[in-house]
Swiss-Prot record:
PTM annotation, UniProt: Methylated by PrmC. Methylation increases the termination efficiency of RF2.
Name assigned to this protein: Peptide chain release factor 2
Chief location: cytoplasm
A Pfam family this chain is assigned to: PCRF
N5-methylglutamine modification, residue list: 250
Gene name of the record: prfB
Keyword list, A-Z: Cytoplasm, Methylation, Protein biosynthesis
Claim: Mitochondrion is one of the keywords in the record: no
Gene3D superfamilies the record matches: 3.30.160.20, 3.30.70.1660, Release factor
A GO term, aspect molecular function: translation release factor activity, codon specific
Compartment(s) of residence: Cytoplasm
Job description of the protein: Peptide chain release factor 2 directs the termination of translation in response to the peptide chain termination codons UGA and UAA.
Length: 367
């Protein structure tokens, strides 16, 4: 094994050791034991929310421990693989060792990104809202494509998704949609996706096949917990009920099960129609409303800090990524410069590279 390989392996060991220290592997094992005991409690599922929280946290903790242990095992095996390559004098074995070293660096660096999620709410689950912007029916179709992209990403990671509300456009696509991603660190991970996403393509809705630019906004909020003390007095809330509707305005329910909540002091409106009962829809809508009120509170606090620092801050809704399907194919993040020439894979949920680059960019900016 040459000196460059030795230096690279030593560098990987330093990075992985830092990851293990930040994740507190011994503490992680203790946490798994505690969660396993809680999961074994026969009364756990008397409280559905608590049961889901414990099982989700346990699955995530076990996954993190498994990943970091696998990385350590692979790194320990790497020098042995190079020794076998030297003894065999077989170029294919050397190539195998080199390929494993490159892949191992990618995997360790991806795990390192997880340690950068140290914000106050980063550990939370996420509430994601997608809204179509300028571009008419193309924008509505684009919003639905983005929704599918994020749901496919969550499914690839085995994160449960709960759709609260989908407002369908008349011709195609959606006006807006709100859904939750139930996974620890979902908020910290997806928060870098917030902003305006731009699509350039030949419009499938234009009979002259002209190129169309469409926009959609992505909003990512942390799920509210009881410790956030987001209390909503009954007098501040207006509750309206109506029948759920599907694509083209078709009624999908014969009862008034859909719920619209209006927070009177702020004018924030939340709707939910995807659950089967009015009560379930109201509970889901309240969760989204609380998340939006928490975000409003955070924005006010950030504005105060920016005023003290003389910093204008970054505004929500700024264009952050461009997806070009025609005349060439490219997806490029305008903040990080990270780009991929395979839009089909990205729109099918392969966005980890963009997320990792976004988290690193955010940490450098905040430093």
């Amino acid at each position: 094994m040459d000196l460059d390989c030795q230096a690279d392996i030593a560098d990987l060991d330093t990075t992985l050791t830092t990851v293990e220290r930040v994740l507190d592997v011994d503490g992680l094992r203790a946490r798994i034991k505690t969660l396993e005991e809680a999961a074994a409690d026969p009364n756990l599922w008397d409280d559905q929310a608590r049961g889901q929280q414990v099982t989700s946290q346990l699955s995530h903790a076990q996954g993190e421990l498994r990943r970091v242990e696998e990385l350590r095992s692979r790194l320990d095996d790497l020098p042995v693989l190079y020794e076998l390559a030297e003894e065999s004098e077989d170029n294919s074995v050397v190539a195998e060792a080199d390929a494993e070293r490159v892949k191992l660096r990618e995997d360790i660096e991806a795990m390192e990104v997880r340690t950068l999620l140290s914000g106050e709410y980063d550990e939370r689950e996420a509430v994601v809202t997608i809204r179509s912007g300028a571009g008419g029916v193309d924008a509505a179709d684009w919003a639905e494509m983005l929704m599918r992209m994020y749901i496919r990403w969550a499914e690839a990671h085995k994160y449960p998704v709960e759709v609260f509300d989908t407002s369908y456009a008349e011709e195609a696509g959606i006006k807006s949609a709100t859904f939750a991603v139930h996974a620890p660190f979902a908020y910290g991970t997806l928060s870098v996706e917030q902003g305006t996403h731009r699509l350039v393509r030949i419009s499938p809705f234009d009979n002259q096949s002209r190129r169309q630019t469409s926009f959609a906004d992505v909003e990512v909020l942390p799920v509210v917990e009881t410790t956030d003390h987001i209390d909503i007095p009954e007098g501040d809330l207006r509750v309206d009920v109506y029948r759920s509707s599907g694509p083209g305005g078709q009624s999908v329910n014969t009862t008034d099960s859909a719920v619209r909540l209006t927070h009177i002091p702020t004018g924030i409106v939340v709707t939910c129609q995807n659950e089967k009962s009015q009560l379930q829809n109201k509970v889901a809508a309240m969760r989204v409303l609380q998340a939006r009120l928490l975000e409003r509170k955070r924005q006010e606090e950030r504005a105060e800090m920016d005023a003290l620092k003389g910093d204008g801050g970054s505004s929500w809704g700024t264009q952050m990524r461009s997806y070009v399907l025609q005349p060439y194919q490219m997806v490029k993040d305008l903040r990080t410069e990270y780009e991929v020439g395979n839009p089909a894979a990205v729109l099918d949920g392969d966005i980890d590279g963009f997320i990792e680059a976004g988290i690193r960019w955010r940490n450098r900016r905040d430093d």
